[in-house]
């Protein structure tokens, strides 16, 4: 039995690629995210035929009191419909406490991880932040049901599947995984389209009150570069820009770009250091 835990649509695509590459059967999948997001439902439907059991659960609510105990209780609740024992558990977010709690309420023989977009190769990402926990705190958390922390996962990780095998990764035990077969893409024409990939703008800057200023700069960039298409981030649908075609689709950027390539278009990609660009 195999369990995949995903938190983004890109992770669902990678999970699907791993299942197909390794020819896995008896797969369960847990998706932690927004049930009201159409993209989540779309990509869950793509992977469902490869799985025995799939569920979509909301992320645990943030709280400052008894958070370890509350996460443990929540992990037990969402895992009630799953097996108690798995041969291998696959996931990307090895730094997320809820993942640690889920691992603590089941048993497994092996852990394998895969990329969370570019976070694994971006040394400024949250994955690279020091999260060492005092021994006394670990003991207390263990009493509350949390057996694992980030450093434990990194030690237990058997294999890491990556989209960027040639780049340094926070996890060294790498194995390449491919989402797109470029040989099947049309060779292209002389027509070039410019695409801007959006981001979560409140996450892109330190000072949250300057978001509107950043939005204005993005609009100026669109005008100056004569951008043809704007693809918003799945978690940032609040902003629409002028003088550009805003693409509102259930597909994620990687799939939208692939469709353009299949049409034979040449593309110039602009953005905020996203997986689709790399």
Named regions from a protein language model:
Residues 4, 28-31, 88-92, 111-113, ...:
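Short, hydrophobic beta-strand segments that form beta-sheet elements in well-ordered domains
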Residues 1-30, 185-186, 192-229:
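N-terminal beta-strand-loop-alpha-helix module at the start
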Residues 3-143, 277:
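Active-site and donor-binding regions of nucleotide-sugar-utilizing enzymes
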Residues 115, 122-195:
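A nucleotide-sugar donor-handling region in carbohydrate enzymes
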Residues 4, 15, 254-278:
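A donor-sugar binding/catalytic signature common to diverse glycosyltransferases
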Residues 94-98, 231-238, 273-277:
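Short, polar loop motifs at secondary-structure junctions
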Residues 16, 68-77, 98-100, 208-222, ...:
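Well-ordered, non-membrane alpha-helical segments in soluble/globular domains
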